[in-house]
């Protein structure tokens, strides 16, 4: 109830003068804010703004489309800039993600990598057994200098052998719900310990109450993974469910 209370406060008492010194406000992940939150932002910060985001990274329906209601809040003279070139991902990853979201107008930066693979398994345990086999992380924690040295050595070996086999610093198992993430974490904990993996230092469950982020294998949900980057990612979703809302969750992951 905090946002309705804040809205009533600013409507009744006016704007806090401590914000008057702010000349320009930058809002990121614009798709994650509601209409009420934007109304509060407008009252709190009567200054120029730059609002950034990815419209496709939302689980809301068309009635909550930020692009649709922002002009009604900030005025019709707002300037809209659409950035259609993607630099972050490889062509293979970006093409796969855009297909999930039905995006066709994006220009992809010419950078290639391994293609995205989709595999089906009878259940979560079998899927995570495959994750353990394909995971490319050091089993024990190492210093940053040691990690750089090992990566260089692995890359030199891979180059000599014509392969791309080397260890990563970070990896993630991304699920749909918090319960699925918790279940996956405990399954992975047992299976990785059996493989000699230092799970205390190299395995973590990232949730809403987490206070730190460490290297190694992170298990989390698609909505907690937003804004984070990993060297290797395993997205574990129910294969039979291809509904629009689940496809959007896959895109975000």
Regions found by a protein language model. Give the residues of each.
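Coupling/switch/interface segments within P-loop NTPase motor domains and analogous charged loops
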Residues: 1-5, 135
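Low-complexity/IDR signal
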Residues: 6-7, 93
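Conserved helicase motor core of SF1/SF2 NTP-dependent helicases
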Residues: 12-24, 31-252
